[in-house]
Amino acid sequence: MSVCALTLILGCFLLFLGDISKPAEGCTCAPSHPQDAFCNSDIVIRAKVVGKKLMKDGPFGTMRYTVKQMKMYRGFNKMPQVQYIYTEASESLCGVKLEVNKYQYLITGRVYEGKVYTGLCNLIERWEKLTFAQRKGLNHRYPLGCTCKIKPCYYLPCFITSKNECLWTDMLSNFGYPGYQSKNYACIKQKEGYCSWYRGWAPPDKTTINTTDP
């Protein structure tokens, strides 16, 4: 098994709630709030794929995408300029397929031995599909919440058990995942020391610090 496969398996596990996860044959990933995806990644960039090459480095091979980095949101200390993104060539091993010279993507991934690896269990989305709040989150809010814990709720009852948790209930909605909290909210530590959901178009300040919506 290639290094890419070993790396991705660590972040990709089977989930019995198949209708709220992202299936791709043998690859099934647990839902992840965009803030968690941001905070748990070594690299977060906005980039356009400009080329690809199948690397013969294992039984299934690895796809190497050449990217033009537009902006980096996380990973300056790891790799300030990303040129290549690696992923499993097989979708059954959580490999992701990206269009060449077509879209700009938000890409998250991990760095291993000087290379950036990503896959279906990482957050990868076409840039134009991100909400305004998600784009703001990348620039300002998500980094403020990396010490908070987003606790998913799959069925009722569910509760927070510590002051650093935000209860994530998108999976209970009839609209499914990703839902309203994923698209519009960030879980941010407040000045009183607890974490709560924050929604707004400006960084938190004393006039909004006590918001607990939703």
Curated annotation (Swiss-Prot):
Gene Ontology CC annotation, any one: extracellular space
Subcellular localization, as worded in the UniProt entry: Secreted, Extracellular space, Extracellular matrix
Disulfide partners: C27-C94, C29-C121, C39-C146, C148-C195, C153-C158, C166-C187
Signal peptide boundaries: 1-26
All residue ranges annotated as the NTR domain in the record: 27-146
Record keyword Lipid biosynthesis present: no
GO biological process: negative regulation of membrane protein ectodomain proteolysis; response to cytokine; response to hormone
MF-aspect GO terms: metalloendopeptidase inhibitor activity; protease binding; zinc ion binding
Annotated keywords: Disulfide bond, Extracellular matrix, Metal-binding, Metalloenzyme inhibitor, Metalloprotease inhibitor, Protease inhibitor, Secreted, Signal, Zinc
Metal-binding listed as a keyword: yes
Top-rank taxon: Eukaryota
Residues annotated as binding Zn(2+): C27
PANTHER family the UniProt entry points to: METALLOPROTEASE INHIBITOR, METALLOPROTEINASE INHIBITOR 3
Function: Complexes with metalloproteinases (such as collagenases) and irreversibly inactivates them by binding to their catalytic zinc cofactor. May form part of a tissue-specific acute response to remodeling stimuli.
Family: Belongs to the protease inhibitor I35 (TIMP) family.
Official protein name in the record: Metalloproteinase inhibitor 3
UniProt source species: Xenopus laevis
Taxon lineage: Eukaryota, Metazoa, Chordata, Craniata, Vertebrata
